[in-house]
């Protein structure tokens, strides 16, 4: 059997730090970010299905979210102000992402490639799946800002404002539900969120 470096590369997502130009109280890596995005994307899809008549496969969306940043194992995490400095840079970075995604897919064994390709290549996702994962991605970045700000790190003040605008652009009923039900707890301390459920 031919050796594959696919998962050896993916395991290095934990070595790539997000928010590289900003001082962080707690450093966040791409691997843990991807897990949180998967959880939130699953929740958004489930909320849409349960509350707002959606017909989404929430488990599949969680899987897509797990793989949504895998190309960064080859490209690194380019800071948002650089990535979107102008439309030309944004377009070129998208092209680089596509090349990295294809390179990752090509690392998978031939007999498994058709399984991993549609998880890594966003072009294989439906518009609705893309929208949910993008909402979850922005929500998780916003939650990171709340955590940093609550720890006294004002470095994330502008990022929070920028992400509030992004969330407004991606707004949906399921996001409104998530923001109302789950997000307020991120402003609280461990003692405050543990009061109602002592062990």
From Swiss-Prot:
Catalytic activity, as annotated = a 2'-deoxyribonucleoside 5'-phosphate + H2O = a 2'-deoxyribonucleoside + phosphate
Q: Which GO terms describe its cellular component?
A: cytoplasm
Grouped into one coarse class, the protein's main location is cytoplasm
Q: Which residues bind a divalent metal cation?
A: 33, 68-69, 137
Residue(s) at site: Appears to be important in orienting the phosphate for catalysis: 18
The protein's name:
5'-deoxynucleotidase YfbR
User: Which organism does this record belong to?
Assistant: Salmonella arizonae (strain ATCC BAA-731 / CDC346-86 / RSK2980)
One GO MF term on file is: nucleotide binding
**Which residues take part in binding substrate?**
18-19, 33, 69, 77-80, 137
Q: Which residues form a coiled coil?
A: none
Similarity section: Belongs to the 5DNU family.
User: What is a single Pfam family found in this protein's UniProt entry?
Assistant: YfbR-like
UniProt keyword Nucleotide-binding present: yes
List the cofactors: a divalent metal cation
- Function, as annotated: Catalyzes the strictly specific dephosphorylation of 2'-deoxyribonucleoside 5'-monophosphates.
């Amino acid at each position: 059997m031919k050796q594959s470096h696919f998962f050896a590369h993916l395991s290095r997502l934990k070595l790539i730090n997000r928010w590289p130009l900003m001082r962080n109280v707690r450093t966040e890596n791409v691997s843990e970010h991807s897990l949180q995005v998967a959880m939130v994307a699953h929740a958004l899809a489930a909320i849409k299905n349960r509350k707002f008549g959606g017909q989404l496969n929430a488990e599949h969306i969680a899987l897509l979210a797990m793989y949504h940043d895998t190309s960064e194992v080859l490209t690194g995490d380019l800071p948002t102000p650089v990535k979107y400095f102008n439309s030309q840079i944004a377009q070129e970075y998208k092209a680089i992402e596509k090349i990295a995604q294809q390179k990752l897919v090509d690392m998978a064994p031939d007999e498994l490639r058709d399984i991993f390709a549609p998880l890594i290549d966003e072009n294989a996702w439906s518009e609705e799946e893309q929208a949910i994962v993008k909402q979850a991605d922005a929500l998780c970045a916003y939650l990171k800002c709340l955590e940093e700000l609550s720890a006294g790190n004002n470095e994330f003040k502008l990022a929070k404002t920028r992400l509030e605008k992004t969330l407004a652009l991606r707004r949906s009923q399921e996001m409104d539900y998530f923001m109302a039900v789950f997000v307020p707890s991120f402003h609280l301390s461990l003692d405050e969120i543990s009061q109602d459920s002592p062990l």
